[in-house]
């Protein structure tokens, strides 16, 4: 992982993705003229801080671009749902059905990826302004990252359900801090994307650089220690190491998206558009 420069202090984003798909926030996808209903829902005044009179970037977009924004945010919310399902199963020590739940969420992520990809290709063919092109390129190039994030989260869910009955509780508990941190990174990334918040995008990079790597190394050391102390449990220890590695890579892909978003916002700042 590349070295990163110091980041600004943390400004916590509103946790408008914390609840798992409440109907008011996550309506079923429908084809509507105008902004995607998901974006309108995220602007609920009960969950967002007071804003100035300026219009949110997500709400001021052309209809086609707003639809892409809504679907991209939905991909992030699915990732958060998946991480929450893993975290709750680990906290409660109830792992039955976790893989099936993760498979459903991953399938929805894959479907959204195809929808967004098609929308981007249509936009590219139609001709775009420089700013619109920068937005669609950022989204298009980030789709592979979010798809990989979903893959890694699914792999962790599957391994957790498979090996949890044979693993010690301490092994499973080691995953929780990293999962919580990654969930926070997803929330910050979603807020940065919806609100064009540069600080929130940089928070994603800072959290990965300062905390994810340290937690990953800690988990790897713990896995190696257990492997030495209990060689008969080598398969479980190696699986714990693999889950830690997958979570660390998941964070790397979130950082890749945040870096592209930072570049997009800096470009808009220089052009006086933010």
From Swiss-Prot:
Gene3D superfamilies for the chain: Phosphate transport system protein phou homolog 2, domain 2
Top-level lineage group: Bacteria
Biological process, per Gene Ontology: intracellular phosphate ion homeostasis; negative regulation of phosphate metabolic process
Record-linked InterPro entries: P_transport_PhoU, PhoU-like_sf, PhoU_dom
Cystine pairings recorded for this chain: none
Protein family: Belongs to the PhoU family.
Protein name: Uncharacterized protein DR_2053
Origin species: Deinococcus radiodurans (strain ATCC 13939 / DSM 20539 / JCM 16871 / CCUG 27074 / LMG 4051 / NBRC 15346 / NCIMB 9279 / VKM B-1422 / R1)
């Amino acid at each position: 992982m590349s070295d990163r420069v110091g980041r600004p202090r943390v400004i916590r984003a509103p946790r408008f993705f914390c609840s798992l798909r409440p109907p008011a926030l996550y309506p079923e996808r429908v084809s509507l003229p105008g902004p995607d209903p998901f974006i309108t829902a995220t602007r609920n005044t009960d969950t967002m801080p007071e804003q100035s009179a300026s219009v949110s970037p997500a709400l001021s977009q052309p209809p086609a671009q707003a639809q892409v924004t809504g679907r991209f945010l939905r991909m992030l919310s699915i990732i958060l749902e998946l991480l929450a399902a893993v975290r709750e199963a680990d906290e409660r020590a109830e792992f039955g059905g976790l893989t099936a739940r993760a498979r459903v969420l991953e399938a929805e992520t894959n479907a959204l990826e195809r929808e967004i990809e098609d929308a981007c290709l249509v936009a590219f063919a139609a001709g775009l302004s420089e700013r619109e092109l920068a937005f669609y390129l950022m989204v298009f190039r980030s789709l592979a990252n979010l798809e990989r994030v979903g893959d890694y989260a699914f792999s962790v869910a599957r391994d957790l359900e498979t090996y949890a009955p044979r693993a010690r509780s301490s092994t499973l508990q080691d995953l929780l801090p990293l999962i919580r941190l990654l969930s926070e990174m997803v929330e910050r990334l979603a807020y940065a994307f919806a609100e064009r918040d540069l600080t929130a995008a940089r928070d994603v990079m800072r959290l990965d650089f300062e905390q994810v790597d340290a937690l990953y190394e800690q988990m790897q050391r713990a896995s190696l220690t257990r492997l030495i102390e209990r060689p008969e449990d080598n398969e479980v220890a190696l699986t714990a190491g693999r889950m830690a590695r997958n979570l660390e890579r998941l964070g790397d892909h979130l950082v890749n998206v945040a870096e592209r978003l930072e570049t997009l916002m800096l470009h808009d700042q220089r052009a006086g558009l933010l």
